[in-house]
Amino acid sequence: MAYSTTSFGFRYMITHVVKNLMIANVVAFFLTLLVGRDFMFDWFAFQPTQIFFRPWGVVTYMFLHGGWWHLFFNMLVLFFFGPPLEGRWGENEFLKFYFCCGLGGVALSYFFLPAVVVGASAAMYGLMLAFAMNWPNVPIYIWGIFPVKGQVPCELDCCHSCLERFRGQQ
C-alpha cells in the first residue's frame, strides 16, 4: 500500500521525504538508547515548563519515542499513509503538512494537557486524516487479507485514542 490509487490497490513504494523522516526517527531513537533517555528527553522533548528555555522542543519532540512499539507504530503509519500524500502534494507541501500537524499537536497539548510530550503521533494522526479525506473508499488490507475502506483506520485510531484519553493511558 503506498503510491498508486487505482482500484487495484497500492503498490509498496517509499518516497523521498517519508524515507528521510523514517531514518531521522530511527536515528534519534538509537541516539536516545546510546546517550540515555533522561538526557534526550530533558533536552529535546517538549516540556511546557521549559518552552522559553528550550524552544526547539516544539519540533524535536517529534523525533523522540517512548519505546520500540511507539516508534514501530508511528513508522508503520508513516510508511503506509505518507507516500500517497507525498506523491499527491509533492515533497515540500507534504513536509509542511507533516510539521504543521506536529506543531498543532504540541499546541493542543500545551493548552489542554500540559505535560512532557514525545513522539510523532500528532503528525501521524494528521497523515491518517488526510489520507482518509483524499481516499476514503480505497481498500486497505489489514494483515494483507481483510479489506477495509481507507477512512476506517483513521476512525478506529481516533476512537481508540479518545478511549485511552478517558482512561488516562496516554
How would you describe each model-predicted region?
Residues M1-Q170:
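A detector for small-residue-rich transmembrane helices and their helix-helix packing motifs
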